């Protein structure tokens, strides 16, 4: 039976999520978004209203298609008594051995999640990202396009691993970090902030 899905966020990321929903054989009911002057339809589905209108669609499942982790968290905590949809593209490889994916998470095309990995709620595992064995990703983490996490990595809540970044095995990254594009993390990161370069170092504020 097809699931009926309402997507929160009529944006580029929302288009991708809509495509994943359709590829999984489910149906997009429409989008909720607080932006002004939106068209009546987006990505082939209707704009249903503002986010606060979600209660009209309680028979559907919901997914937040917004890249910013703090905004995803705010919306997830605001919406009460909803069923969260987990979007996994059919081309993604998700191990069946002791692997868990939290509600509201998006797993995009050609992503790989290996055995023993634990993915939190409302995460984004972007196109072609690799999450190796026994990783732990806390809620609201975003692993960007082509990023690679070696085995037994722990990523704290709301941390963003940038496009093409790599994390060595057995590393821990604390919450609320941004790891820049192409950065290579070879040591534990214990202080929130932005980290760039090879090896990754904290970017000092000016």
Placement of each model-derived feature along the sequence:
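Generic structural signal for conserved hydrophobic packing positions in ordered secondary structure
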Residues: 9, 62, 84, 132-133
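Short amphipathic alpha-helical segments
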Residues: 18-20, 74-78, 119-120, 190-191
């Amino acid at each position: 039976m097809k699931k009926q899905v309402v997507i929160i966020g009529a944006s580029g990321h929302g288009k991708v999520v809509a495509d994943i929903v359709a590829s999984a054989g489910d149906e997009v009911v429409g989008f909720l978004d607080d932006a002004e002057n939106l068209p009546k339809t987006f990505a082939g589905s209707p704009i249903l209203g503002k986010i606060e209108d979600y209660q009209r669609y309680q028979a559907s499942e919901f997914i937040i298609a917004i890249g910013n982790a703090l905004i995803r968290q705010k919306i997830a905590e605001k919406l009460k008594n909803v069923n969260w949809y987990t979007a996994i593209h059919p081309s993604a490889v998700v191990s069946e051995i002791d692997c868990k994916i939290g509600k509201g998470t998006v797993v995009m095309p050609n992503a790989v999640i290996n055995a023993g990995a634990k993915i939190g709620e409302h995460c984004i595992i972007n196109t072609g990202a690799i999450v190796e064995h026994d990783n732990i990703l806390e809620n609201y983490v975003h692993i960007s396009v082509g990023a690679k996490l070696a085995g037994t990595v722990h990523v704290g809540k709301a941390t963003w691993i940038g496009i093409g970044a790599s994390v060595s095995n057995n590393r821990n990254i604390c919450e609320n970090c941004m790891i820049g594009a192409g950065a290579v993390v070879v040591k534990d990161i214990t202080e929130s902030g932005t980290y760039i370069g090879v090896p990754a170092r904290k970017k000092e504020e000016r």
